[in-house]
């Protein structure tokens, strides 16, 4: 905390310690804060800052800026993963100094690093290590990172074709999101991550009906929360499932067109290329 910012602001407004503290705390409390660094209660500090027409966060300028930069970088990594731009995600991950992360940021970093490694088919032992750090003391870790760790481990086992173990972890993740309350756009993304990859697993083992149930749930969540970034991948997997289930060709084509539209909206070039290949196969009647 940079107390000098507080003192400078008080002096800029021409307030004495007595005038500023009036109705909030004793002048002695304010003096101990300004002269000796004895921080008062958050309630008192908030009221003092309000009287100075400033936010408490302004007393932590370097931390606030650093956190903001790191959070934006983590946001970008998460979006790269959704957009299937795994190499870009990996480069950003490499640029992060873990020593500068808060506890919440470190949890998020571990989940993102684990997913990037897994989706790029890197060493499974490393991926397990990242996810297991989140599970090692799950009583302290935010619930969303627990169900994301379960999903990541499910993906590892799916890639190994160890489907019984994969299903065990995907089911644990699904069970957790059933009781999870979505409170932010970030929460939407993480719940959709579970649903999408669990649906991918069930499609892989040819349980298309189960996969579709999860995907339709994802479509509903996107609609309720007005987000589109996962819709392209959800619609494309629905199209693939419909194709494998030998649904009406018109339905498959409509789903693939929807997927392409959302992929263009979200600038997902990787998925657009996959959709084009799929649509060419449909056109040839393969």
Predicted regions, residues:
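Amphipathic alpha-helical segments of tetratricopeptide repeats
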Residues: 90-98, 132-139, 171-182, 216-227, ...
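Structural motif corresponding to the intra-repeat A-B loop/turn of tetratricopeptide repeats
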Residues: 83, 120-121, 153, 160, ...
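A short, Lys/Arg-rich alpha-helix, primarily the initiator
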Residues: 1-12
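Helix-turn-helix repeat elements of alpha-solenoid scaffolds
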Residues: 80-94, 118-133, 163-176, 207-216, ...
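Residue-level signature for tetratricopeptide repeat
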Residues: 79-80, 116-118, 156, 201, ...
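Short alpha-helical DNA-recognition segment
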Residues: 13-32
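"A position-specific structural signal for the A-helix of alpha-solenoid helical repeats
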Residues: 71, 75, 105-116, 145, ...
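DNA major-groove recognition helix of helix-turn-helix/homeodomain DNA-binding modules
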Residues: 43-58
């Amino acid at each position: 905390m940079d107390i000098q910012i507080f003192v400078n602001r008080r002096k800029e407004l021409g307030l004495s310690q007595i005038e500023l503290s009036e109705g909030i705390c004793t002048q002695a409390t304010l003096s101990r804060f300004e002269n000796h660094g004895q921080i008062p209660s958050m309630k008192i500090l908030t009221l003092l800052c309000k009287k100075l027409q400033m936010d408490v966060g302004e007393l932590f300028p370097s931390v606030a800026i650093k956190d903001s930069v790191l959070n934006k970088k983590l946001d970008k990594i998460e979006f790269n993963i959704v957009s299937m731009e795994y190499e870009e995600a990996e480069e950003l991950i490499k640029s992060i100094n873990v020593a500068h992360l808060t506890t919440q940021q470190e949890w998020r970093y571990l989940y993102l690093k684990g997913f990037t490694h897994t989706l790029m088919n890197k060493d499974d032992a490393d991926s397990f290590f990242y996810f297991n750090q989140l599970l090692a003391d799950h009583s302290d870790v935010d619930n969303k990172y627990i169900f994301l760790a379960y999903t990541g481990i499910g993906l590892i086992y799916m890639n190994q074709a160890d489907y019984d173990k994969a299903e065990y972890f995907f089911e644990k993740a699904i069970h957790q999101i059933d009781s999870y309350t979505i409170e932010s756009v970030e929460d939407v993304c993480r719940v959709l991550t579970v649903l999408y990859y669990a649906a991918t697993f069930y499609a892989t083992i040819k349980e298309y009906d189960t996969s579709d149930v999860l995907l339709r749930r994802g479509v509903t969540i996107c609609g309720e929360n007005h987000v589109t970034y996962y819709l392209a991948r959800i619609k494309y997997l629905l199209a693939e499932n419909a194709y494998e289930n030998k649904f009406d060709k018109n339905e498959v084509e409509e789903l693939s067109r929807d997927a392409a539209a959302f992929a263009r909206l979200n600038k997902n070039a990787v998925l657009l290329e996959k959709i084009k290949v799929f649509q060419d196969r449909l056109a040839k009647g393969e």
